[in-house]
């Protein structure tokens, strides 16, 4: 269900009759459960599999040394998200290091893609993370990093918003530098993940 916002489009992309043949259906988002229930299909919400492993530190290629920088992990790389990152960089005095989540052919010449271990290390070693990615958000939390979720496309907010709402840290979703600076820090000791 991840990024599909429009209910009619979602219905057309899913075979509702085939789904109704399953005895049990588990999905990762509350809105997915609600969508299926509105269509007569029973479903339950389950935790994202990335949250099932207690620690990912064994996957890191070397000991974590914190880098004094903002890590920019983007799926969409919009002008607005870049402006937000630059504004946060100016306010904090931290430089930005960019990495991208998938190949965007029109920009591939300037993009750096990391193996998963290095991607995880980039998050674990960052001072702050800016992202629009669900999984970068999850790993920022798992590594206890301050992070900001910048949503350029509203269709991407559901899964991230659902998780942050459950954890009581929904104010990490921002689109304004001043809101980001004013957002309360995350107490990972009381956060549901720990």
Residue ranges and their predicted role:
Residues 1-194:
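Active-site anion-handling motifs in enzyme catalytic cores
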